[in-house]
Amino acid sequence: MGKPYIRRQLNLSLNLEAKKAVVAEVAAVASQSHSAVAIEYRGLTVAEITKLRVAARKGDVYLRVVRNTLASRALEGTDFDCMREGLTGPLMLAFSREEPSAAARVIRDFGKEHPKLVVKMGCLGGRLLPPEGVENLAKMPTKEQAVAMLMGVLQAPIGKFARTLAEPTAKLVRTVAAVRDQKQAT
């Protein structure tokens, strides 16, 4: 076994200030996020995790591997407090900052190509979601899609009303055209 001072130098654990900084950073992100997903990354290579991080950045998702005790402290008092009991094993936390379904969507899409990525739980609005709930969250439309759907629903009655108003005039035109065609035929 090596000398004690060499082992201390190689110790990769965080000092107290670094731990406090990690807790503060994750707590700040959690307080500004709409939803969170906890995933187990066991079995993924560094290259695969890097791809996941790139996909998360593109989707405006905060992705962080945090020790469970530090994550528990960071989530305390936030909407994601309900996740604290399930923080066991090697977990990575993904937070959606803009859209509630962004983190779940990024994780689902990445998980299709990498089955070793396992969704453990999620949280939305202070409610704990099982893995199936995270899948349903991923299927939710984006904000732009939801606005487009709403506009379509709002436009439909107006369009129908406009066609209803135009119908008597169109019917009169068709009747006059039919009479004209009948007179020309005889």
UniProtKB/Swiss-Prot annotation:
SUPFAM superfamilies: Ribosomal protein L10-like. Keywords: Ribonucleoprotein, Ribosomal protein, RNA-binding, rRNA-binding. GO terms for molecular function: large ribosomal subunit rRNA binding; structural constituent of ribosome. It comes from the Bacteria. GO terms for biological process: translation. InterPro entries: Ribosomal_uL10, Ribosomal_uL10-like_sf, Ribosomal_uL10_bac, Ribosomal_uL10_bac_type, Ribosomal_uL10_CS_bac. GO terms for cellular component: large ribosomal subunit. It holds the Pfam family Ribosomal_L10. Belongs to the universal ribosomal protein uL10 family. PANTHER family: 39S RIBOSOMAL PROTEIN L10, MITOCHONDRIAL. HAMAP family: Ribosomal_uL10. Forms part of the ribosomal stalk, playing a central role in the interaction of the ribosome with GTP-bound translation factors. Part of the ribosomal stalk of the 50S ribosomal subunit. The N-terminus interacts with L11 and the large rRNA to form the base of the stalk. The C-terminus forms an elongated spine to which L12 dimers bind in a sequential fashion forming a multimeric L10(L12)X complex. This is Large ribosomal subunit protein uL10.
